[in-house]
Amino acid sequence: MGTQTAAASDIAQHTPMMQQYLRIKGEHPGTLVFYRMGDFYELFFDDAEKAARLLDLTLTQRGASGGNPIKMAGVPHHAVEQYLAKLVKLGESVAICEQIGDPATSKGPVERKVVRVVTPGTLTDAALLSDKSDTYLLAACAGHNRRGVVTTVGLAWLNLASGALRLAEVAPDQVAAALERIRPAEILVADAPSSSDANAWSVPTGFGATTRVPLWHFDVASGTQRLCDQLEVAGLDGFGAHSLTCACGAAGALLLYAAATQGQQLRHVRSLKVEYESEYIGLDPSTRRNLELTETLRGTDSPTLCSLLDTCCTTMGSRLLRHWLHHPPRDASFAQARQQAIGALLDSPPQASLDALCGALRQISDIERITGRLALLSARPRDLSSLRDTFIALPELRAQLVPLTGAADSLARIHASLEPPADCVDLLTRAVAQEPAAMIRDGGVIARGYDVDLDELRDISENCGQFLIDLETRERARTGIGNLRVEYNKVHGFYIEVTRGQTDKVPDDYRRRQTLKNAERYITPELKTFEDKALSAQERALAREKALYDALLQSLLPFIADCQRVASALAELDLLAAFAERARALDWVAPNFSATGGIDIEQGRHPVVEAQVEQFIANDCMLNPERKLLLITGPNMGGKSTFMRQTALIALMAYVGSYVPARRASFGPIDRIFTRIGAADDLAGGRSTFMVEMTEAAAILNDATPQSLVLMDEIGRGTSTFDGLALAWAIARHLLAHNGCHTLFATHYFELTQLPAEFPHAANVHLSAVEHGHGIVFLHAVNEGPANQSYGLQVAQLAGVPNAVIRAARKHLAYLEQQSAGAPAPQLDLFSAPVAMLEDADDESIAPALDAATRTLVERLRDIDPNDLRPRDALDLLYELHELAKSPDAPR
């Protein structure tokens, strides 16, 4: 059987079990089916081949079905999470098919069904999720105008682990920026139209696994109704979503898919947030990468702004930090409220100290995700004990906040939200054992005293030992057999063992159970009755405990909203405490905000770089309506890019609500932050470095407003000198004359330093350096005025460029400077070079003859040992070297 399709072509040819498997597989095409068989999950046919390749499993063939061998691969059920994690990371989806029938009573194959589908965007199990980042499932629905052109894209995304659902509608060219901000793990799209359709639209690639679902899933009317049903409301006006038709269509597909993967209702999805582009400071994908907010340019998690700020005591706080960094609000009142809370935490009295608060927060579990699993009825016993212990710890935490509630409104709100649901705490305390087993199947989960029947069954199982001791004592006295023993094993159950020399004393009511070489084992009616009762008691206790646990999960469902309220407050408090800790430890200050446009930073520092070096040089940055653009010149490695990035990061941190690394800082309104810093070829997209650079520049020129902050670093590279200079000049003029944005413009084109003479709103600043011999010392200080040179040759020398190349470069630099001082030289093509350059060059690659003569002299000198030379020998050697110097090949 070569393929899955072939296997399913004639299902009647297969064995009953394989018929069952093929029916289930047919309901989940494109998904790996984990088919439970005893203690293993088995995969068959194509699934087995694929899983064996991806998971490094052994592929076997066992038996035949339909006349063909059955390819198999399997994983043990107790280790399934680690295999699921690998598959999900590779973008695969897995259908978990469990045995739901009783093998003892089943006629034919045991009944099985898919209980859940694990996909990259629908993870809830702690073993499959990243602790410090959210996992989102996103659906995209395109809206067309009358000509069939896509004009709007509706987005709906869900964090299934927490129940957070959000909607937005964006223009088609803004979808990539939205996906970069959300970073979904899985994207749902409608089945693609014909590729020949001129109006066809597709989601940008590279943002998560893509799953195609039928087009009718995105029906707007059905999606709107499904959304209303999910939120238990009559309409969406209260959420501000009534006019977002495309987003509602996306939400309908999203909810349908998520519920199908879980096999049940999404009880914890009871709220909706509509996101508008105007709410947040715009950060395009390039800006998020260049500022290294949550990921370095090398793709690592550290060192980044997020890794520096993340001293959170809970994983809930860490996830909220990432969300805040990618969603800085434009409205400064949000930042001011957060900074007010940070100030209150820093000024807290001893009984409510920041250290004590952090100590209490460290005892808190991730109840946000526990609540999600509780709503999906997949919470495990230790989830419930963690939830209980967290609720029990809340009164102490709330008591520490009481002295601070008057100093910050947000802390008063958090204090009120941390009130635990009393009935839920009582139920968990009564029902769950202090230290429950990891899985309900292991028993020991339900607390003693919660259920009388369970306690009785446990007593029977646990009192076996005493019964056996008593029985053994009585039987020894009754039979006179002093070495008689009453024991138990899993194969034969309970038995009475008598050695062969004592078997003549065995009473008539003993029935032989097993014969050994030196002993006989017996069973009595009394022992048999006890055996039946004891063995069935353990089995019945586990069954009773499972039923009680399932009922307990149902009883906890009404408290989902309360649990979510507490989790949200804990995450916010934890993050504010982390901000306060960073401000105290790193000497940060609270920024100011004003309605007047501009940025005024005194002694600002790059937060991440400062943490990596022993000493950091702080610098000022002033941008205002009279000083819109700073032309930044100076040497490579002098700190231009660091200065630009630190300005953007300090502004971003201020609007996020953190204190900032500066002596003083003030900010006017900021609507977007753009960066054009560094570039690389986009090989997959067929774009050169220069094309990438110009594309980013075009986006800035088209979208930047007077309230935007723009960072441009060395624009114009990658083409001829004059072309690059002309473009850089024109771009700078356009930013000043048309965009009017606040701009930091780093360049090595010194001709641009004349721009302030034409535009008074531009100013020159430079990064200073000092030459020392042929070397250079970077001062990293920003000073007013233009730089006098770039120190490119000195930097090249520091990088290890051979001295011969440096010498040749110096000579050619002198030639170029001489040319520029006189008549302008024509712009040369790629293969032209000035004749003077070739005539005057002393580079070994240009003048090999010179190198050969020099080499002869050097080799002769190297062969000489001065310590062995007599006076006469030294004189002869001097004549020899003199003759070599007079040779035609010697340098003149």
Swiss-Prot record:
GO molecular function, one term: mismatched DNA binding
GO biological process: mismatch repair
Residues bound to ATP: 634-641
Any GO CC annotation of this UniProt entry: cytosol
PROSITE patterns: DNA_MISMATCH_REPAIR_2
Keywords attached to this entry: ATP-binding, DNA damage, DNA repair, DNA-binding, Nucleotide-binding
Residues spanning the membrane: none
UniProt superkingdom: Bacteria
Matches recorded under InterPro entries: DNA_mismatch_repair_MutS, DNA_mismatch_repair_MutS-lik_N, DNA_mismatch_repair_MutS/MSH, DNA_mismatch_repair_MutS_C, DNA_mismatch_repair_MutS_clamp, DNA_mismatch_repair_MutS_core, DNA_mismatch_repair_MutS_N, DNA_mismatch_repair_MutS_sf
Family (UniProt): Belongs to the DNA mismatch repair MutS family.
Role noted for this protein: This protein is involved in the repair of mismatches in DNA. It is possible that it carries out the mismatch recognition step. This protein has a weak ATPase activity.
Protein name as annotated: DNA mismatch repair protein MutS
